[in-house]
Amino acid sequence: MSKLGSLVRERILILDGAMGTMIQQYNLTEGDFRGERFSQIPGQMKGNNDLLCLTRPDVIQDIHRKYLAAGADIIETNTFSSTRVSMADYHVQDYVREMNLAAVRLARKVADEFTSLTPDKPRFVAGSVGPTNKTCSMSPDVNNPAFRALSYDELADAYREQMEALLEGGVDALLIETIFDTLNAKAAIFAAGQAMETVGVHVPLMLSVTVSDIGGRTLSGQTLDAFLASVQHADIFSVGLNCSFGAHQLKPFLEQLAARAPYYISAYPNAGLPNSLGTYDQTPADMAHEVKEYIHEGLVNIIGGCCGTTDAYIAEYSSLIAGATPHQPVPRPENLWLSGLELLEVKPENNFVNVGERCNVAGSRKFLRLINEKKYDEALSIARRQVEDGAQVIDINMDDGLLDARTEMTTFLHLIASEPEIARVPVMIDSSKWEVIVAGLKCLQGKSIVNSISLKEGEDKFLEHARTVKRYGAAAVVMAFDEKGQADTYERKIEVCERAYRLLVDKAGFNPHDIIFDPNVLAVATGMDEHNNYAVDFIRAAGWIRKNLPGAHVSGGVSNLSFSFRGNNYIREAMHAVFLYYAIREGMDMGIVNPAASVLYTDIPADILERIEDVVLNRRPDAAERLIETAERLKAEAEAAKTSGGERQAAAHSQLAWREGTSVEERLKYALTKGIGDYLEEDLAEALKLYPKAVSIIEGPLMAGMNHVGDLFGAGKMFLPQVVKTARTMKRAVAILQPVIESEKEEGATAAGKVLLATVKGDVHDIGKNIVSVVMACNGYEIIDLGVMVPAETIVQHAIEEKVDMIGLSGLITPSLDEMVHVAIELEKAGLDVPLLIGGATTSPLHTALKIAPVYHAPVIHLKDASQNATVAAKLMNPKTKEELEEELHEKYRQLCEKNREKQVTTVSLEEARKNKLNLF
């Protein structure tokens, strides 16, 4: 471990402040920047601060000395813009190596002087590596979104040139800072690895990102969680935040980073926010007061300053950190992290990750035609529709003999980057050509999936590909394929997968969670007996992999299974539903599917289900013949209807059978479950005649339908794309009822109370919250809806400003649980006394009792669904019933906590366990 590495564990370290702000105090002229040496170079040179390392080294050395005298442990080299890319603007790009070497020499000399004076307080030099003035993720031309002013390779080469000089000069660490585009940062990380190998020196790698807005995203659109996933492959020493805001505004994002990043945490905020003249008014004492919270709450290991800060600001830190406990990094995630603009964390409770299959020129004739004809807008609409239908990852394949696959992959990925609705999900780069995969990896700022690598060409090529995937920061699909060919039996599948796993983990240093095995979904019912057990072998292999290869995932191209039934979409989709039902139960947690598929396992008629299961599970020797008979019968019935001119009528009759002889409640439930919105107006009009108020329909049959969907999803009989369709249908139903709800409100009626609603930060799901909003409004409450992805500080701010009577927090995903706890803590800190209503798919009474209620003194109530909100709210608005409710909650939560404690396994020390060992002899 480096000296820097051991010291950061012992105490909080101080980083220096702004270089540019300090330089401004010297009132340097154009002549100072140019010196005699650069007097003939065209253009203005003033403002090129890095050049001062060559023309006014005395100034730079003096600034370093002031920061070290102020107490800094780490000073940065004056090389923020010292790359060939940035220096080209000043026509001095050919001097970047000399500039970097000079910058290190200046910083190193002063740092070593101070270390010799105080050996117990060693001083370090970090090589500053800025983001450059170009971006790899965005086009500078709004009319050409596929264009890039700079390629990944050009940027990586420029970074490597800079870093080699910094390492040769003797820096103690490399600091890639002010990251606004994660793809730029990934190029810098890639270059850092190359530079360290070339120079033969390995130093800690520090990253510092900057957020561009109060939503906490980078300029290129990523959330902080997505950023962490994108750089997870790197050997990171620290990660942090700089620039953007002052210490107060930066704190919520720092808290998020500290809670999620398994690294040391750094922060160097600006001196507050700039005034109208672009200067900073915050005093050193005021900034120190805000930074003090970072230190007291254990958020940081390294603290410094950015824009507007000087040595006077840094001098305030020594007294703040004296005796303070440094931040303890959180454990590394035990799940697969993927990202586009947002994080996709693949957890067991995710059930199944849908990889959209339609952006594949080999599998979609329509997509191939659009790419061939350069109709990229229409091709993008296919990707967008898949995301809307619930695809959590988008598979992209451009392998066609008449296409330049590398160019098309690059173009399409560049175009996706300009479409936030698509770019928010991770990408699976799918190609049989390695150069196409590498080209794709250079286009994506998020953490993608490579599809695929295998042992087909032997171990050496396999390891070479695996190391390349890792270096670019991606996960990998590993095909069950080796030198002998495709693994088609259970025994061969587990043999190849185990061998590949050991090579990846033991020799390539691959994160086990980034390994996604594809044990080969092969066609069944082909008429060849040796194919009959293909599905069973896959399902068994999936179970074996999940039990025996820790961390690894299982995926597959599901449509391959039903290849024998091309042309019969119903049978194919039904086969897929059956296969997934059994494969997911065994451990398959990802698959390339059509997210718009509509056949549910539970809706397959019993006779057809039996025959499909006979085939998929290989339960009888004549299974294929029997399913073929069924498929032919269905086809013949369709042909007969067509011949008699009644095809459309027959199809319509079949599709509308659910509407015959059923109650309006049953029809609404079915419509929600299937995501059918065509008859909502008709059915809701009928329901309005039966129910006293429109809100009663929401609380009754519509809520019953939503609960049924939840049950199916939880049982693995319904998947996310279908749930998304349900949510859209529910929104449409509520929108239809909304005018009626408004008209039913009594004129002049005063509000029963004021309710603030929000889906917590990190969660984009709003269907549950929207239903609660409607129900509460119908019951006379004034609603303040803050929307989705709402930070804790925004909730606190609006709760105070609006003087609300209660706050409702919603969340659908697991990370929302931790964020709800965080919101409760912030409400408590702010001194609020407002009841907190908790709801959402992942919430529970037990989590509320154990985690949320203990950190907030006001009532915290978990609500199962929207129908309970109005009743509970009414009790909270009445002082007498509120007191009774609080007593009920206290007793209920006490019992829940007690039962939970009884379930916990009591552990003993290792020494005591050894004393209790079973003695057989």
PLM segments and residue spans:
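Domain-level signal for soluble alpha/beta catalytic cores
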Residues: 1-921
